Amino acid sequence: YDAEVEKTLMGLGFMRSDFTRPTKEFSGGWRMRIELAKILLQKPDLILLDEPTNHLDIESVQWLEDFLKNNAKAVIVISHDKAFVDNLTNRTIEITMGKIYDYKTNYSHYLQLRKERREQQQKHFEEQQREIADITAFIERFK
């Protein structure tokens, strides 16, 4: 277990000399890394991450991506880091207007599919409006 702890802490950017320092000596960003390490080492069935890359350097972000891809069972990520999300995801769920859309793809492909879906919805709406106008005009003729 010690090797796993060391690997996780090193992956998140800590040096071996940091292992014996009290948590209170670390800045807020480094404390966030400590908490992230605690979560990852518990190996939960589901990990919920809110902006996990905010306090990480590039190497730590890459390590976290690799760790999550290879070790996590399920991850829900809320992030503005599009590259991180794109590299990590293989499923994107959109919740909008009371509906759930499930895309079994990465984030970039989801964006394309969402655009296509919205264009189809707009086209359908416009066709529906034309049909309503035609029916209304027909009814008005026979009043």
Regions found by a protein language model. Name each.
Residues 1-127:
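ABC ATP-binding cassette signature C-motif
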